[in-house]
């Protein structure tokens, strides 16, 4: 019996909260087209991310990847910090 490998989503977002231990909250923004008027609208999603080494800080741009559920709300883990926040 062969098992298919699940595709793990990788997304880029900005850290909006680093107050929890080993957990960061990131904001992912995307543009979607309005179905009737055609105007592009910004939509956002907040995710809780597992950060084992507490590497990411507020304002950092990070790449995260989907993983097994770590808790009730955490299903993503930090892959790397792409860009440090100014300051």
Swiss-Prot record:
Keywords: Ribonucleoprotein, Ribosomal protein, RNA-binding, rRNA-binding. GO terms for cellular component: cytosolic small ribosomal subunit. Pfam families: Ribosomal_S17. One of its GO terms (molecular function) is rRNA binding. Gene3D superfamilies: Nucleic acid-binding proteins. GO terms for biological process: translation. Belongs to the universal ribosomal protein uS17 family. One of the primary rRNA binding proteins, it binds specifically to the 5'-end of 16S ribosomal RNA. Part of the 30S ribosomal subunit. This is Small ribosomal subunit protein uS17. It comes from Thioalkalivibrio sulfidiphilus (strain HL-EbGR7). The lineage of its organism: Bacteria, Pseudomonadati, Pseudomonadota, Gammaproteobacteria, Chromatiales.
